[in-house]
Amino acid sequence: MICIPVIDKNINDALKSAEEALKVADIVEFRADLLESVDKQDIEKMAKYPSIITIRADWEGGEYTGDNNKRIELYKTAIENNVKFIDIELKEEKNKELVEFRNKIGSKTKIIVSYHDFEKTPSKQDLMEIVEKELKIGDIAKFATMAQNKNDLLKIFAVISIYEGKIIGIGMGEVGKLTRIIGVELGSILTFASMEGRSSAPGQVDVVKLKKIWELLK
């Protein structure tokens, strides 16, 4: 699966961007934390699209600085509307509450539990421990770490292979681009690609280039 992040500041622009992105991608990620303001009605509109809804907290590299209880309630709105995925941080103390809420109401939403390190890639053992913690909470484990060398790539590829089909593993930065290209082949459920030069993280490959590379690798 290819996922294109939607990073607009205005909800109407975000919905238009999603429609364009879905012409070339399988799914979009609405970065709701990047909106100038976000309410339940906005979440309901986003949930109608094949999407991941992410309201990334500022302490995990996002831009949401509002009340955390409101953030959790917005996630619950996404779950009530059966959005395909939500992405909640491993460090968020209320992540289990969202899983329990999903289970209680019988929502079809899958919960991605994520970890980010914008400076380095931890050891393979540490990455595996992170993934194990994430899978004890949610449906899909995600890690995005800064890749600085070939050893980092090997660690990332190894962990993706171990948890094939229930993981999103990403190496950020220029060195990490290779993980975005072949991670899906090794077992990552999706990769994030940019569109028209707009990206949400360092190292995202343009969607058109990514598809051309995949064609060459067939």
UniProtKB/Swiss-Prot annotation:
Pfam families: DHquinase_I (PF01487). GO terms for molecular function: 3-dehydroquinate dehydratase activity. The active site is at residues 116, 142. Homodimer. Keywords: Amino-acid biosynthesis, Aromatic amino acid biosynthesis, Lyase, Schiff base. Belongs to the type-I 3-dehydroquinase family. The keyword Amino-acid biosynthesis applies. InterPro entries: 3-dehydroquinate_DH_AS (IPR018508), Aldolase_TIM (IPR013785), DHquinase_I (IPR001381), Type-I_3-dehydroquinase (IPR050146). The gene is aroD. The keyword Amino-acid biosynthesis applies. NCBIfam families: aroD. Disulfide bonds: none annotated. 3-dehydroquinate binds at residues 29-31, 56, 180, 200, 204. Its EC number is 4.2.1.10. Pathway: Metabolic intermediate biosynthesis; chorismate biosynthesis; chorismate from D-erythrose 4-phosphate and phosphoenolpyruvate: step 3/7. It comes from Methanococcus aeolicus (strain ATCC BAA-1280 / DSM 17508 / OCM 812 / Nankai-3). This is 3-dehydroquinate dehydratase. It catalyses: 3-dehydroquinate = 3-dehydroshikimate + H2O. Involved in the third step of the chorismate pathway, which leads to the biosynthesis of aromatic amino acids. Catalyzes the cis-dehydration of 3-dehydroquinate (DHQ) and introduces the first double bond of the aromatic ring to yield 3-dehydroshikimate. One of its GO terms (biological process) is amino acid biosynthetic process.
